[in-house]
């Protein structure tokens, strides 16, 4: 039996474990503070559900492990500075940017990037945390410790957000899912919609970009690339060197889920192109209690993470998939009264994708 240790024991590790069971792969999600002696890592392939981690007894051991897949890639992608430098090196389109070293640079920043600046911490920060949208009269809002530790990007006037989830094997082969349409609110992914056939031009551009990134890094496994949709084409926003929230729909909407695909890649199992036959919707459950009335609707698949419910915390998601978009739309309509009011706008956005 193959064994995989996942650095991190959140919902992504949980879903990797679930995906491993039918394949006969024992997946062990482990917390960062676990005692090395209690973790069967010596005979395992090592992967991670997070991009960066503090130094602990366990992470020191894993850092030396020869089967830690992508060990040298994580630091590059975890730092937005080196991530942006990678895009520039490969001549891939991304928002104009620079390192923000000192507050005296602001006049030149706005001269170069325009009236809206997006400031992001180089490391850490997710779901909208560690980011600021600033205009010239708002720069005092930025904490002093951010200078030298943040990049600043041009605010992009985009018409939509999409992500591409793909995987690369040890032999250099790559496979991709169709582009996923995403709705973010307050920096947090709320809803995703995927179709069997994405916009051909966007799909081709996205696959070319993500393939170039994975090949340059020698990356193995699933990677996600978030993009802005603009009249000039796709602009890369950020990368995630792991399974990704916007790929959760693949659990019920694809022949191979992103979690199984990642395990196949890192354990050197066959990596065929996943088949997607029907449209799918994913709704993130954020800071809301479980409601089993959702399951009265036959298209709804509930994925509950068994975490303590707290405001702003991802505690589960709902997947819906069907060949009949009218049935999907009707099911989404029936979900609205079963969800807290804050979900209505995301559900209506998903319905709008079906015309």
Range-by-range predicted roles:
Residues 1-85, 104:
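ATP-binding N-terminal substructure of ATP-dependent carboxylate-amine bond-forming enzymes
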Residues 78-163, 167-213:
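Active-site nucleotide/adenylate-binding loops and adjacent lid/helix of ATP-dependent enzymes
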Residues 96, 116-119, 149-153, 223-224, ...:
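A short linear hydrophobic-aromatic micro-motif
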Residues 166-170, 227-231, 306:
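Short, low-complexity Ser/Thr-rich regulatory SLiMs
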Residues 204-225, 230, 241-288:
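Active-site "cap" helix and flanking loop/linker of ATP-utilizing ligase/carboxylase catalytic domains
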Residues 233-235:
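Conserved protein kinase catalytic/activation segment
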Residues 264-355:
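Peripheral (often C-terminal) accessory segments that flank ATP-dependent C-N-forming ligase machineries
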């Amino acid at each position: 039996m193959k064994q995989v240790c996942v650095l991190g024991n959140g919902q992504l590790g949980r879903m990797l474990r679930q995906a491993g069971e039918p394949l006969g792969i024992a997946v062990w999600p482990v917390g960062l503070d676990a005692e090395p002696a209690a973790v069967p890592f010596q005979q395992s392939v090592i992967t991670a559900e997070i991009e960066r981690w503090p130094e602990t007894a366990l992470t020191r051991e894993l850092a030396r492990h020869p089967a830690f897949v992508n060990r040298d890639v994580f630091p590059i992608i975890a730092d937005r500075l080196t991530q942006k430098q990678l895009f520039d090196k490969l001549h891939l389109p991304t928002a104009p940017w620079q390192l923000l070293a000192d507050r005296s640079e602001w006049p030149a920043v706005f001269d170069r990037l325009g009236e809206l600046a997006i400031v992001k911490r180089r490391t850490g920060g997710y779901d909208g945390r560690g980011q600021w949208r600033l205009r010239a009269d708002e720069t005092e809002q930025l904490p002093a410790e951010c200078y030298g530790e943040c990049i600043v990007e041009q605010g992009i006037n985009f018409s939509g957000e999409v992500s591409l989830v793909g995987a690369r094997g040890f032999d250099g082969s790559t496979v991709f899912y169709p582009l996923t349409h995403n709705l973010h609110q307050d920096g947090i992914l709320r809803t995703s919609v995927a179709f069997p056939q994405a916009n051909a031009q966007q799909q081709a551009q996205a696959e070319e970009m993500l393939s170039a990134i994975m090949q340059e890094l020698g990356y193995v496994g699933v990677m996600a690339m978030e993009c802005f949709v603009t009249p000039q084409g796709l602009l890369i926003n950020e990368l995630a060197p792991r399974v990704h929230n916007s790929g959760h729909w693949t659990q019920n909407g694809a022949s191979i889920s992103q979690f199984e695909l990642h395990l196949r890649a890192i354990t050197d199992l066959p990596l065929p192109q996943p088949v997607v036959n029907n449209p799918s919707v994913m709704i993130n459950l954020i800071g809301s209690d479980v409601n089993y009335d959702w399951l009265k609707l036959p298209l709804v698949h509930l994925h509950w993470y068994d975490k303590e419910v707290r405001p702003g915390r991802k505690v589960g998601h709902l997947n819906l998939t069907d060949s009949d978009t009218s049935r999907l739309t009707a099911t989404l309509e029936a979900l609205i009264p079963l969800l807290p009011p804050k979900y209505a706008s995301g559900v209506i956005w998903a319905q709008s994708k079906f015309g």
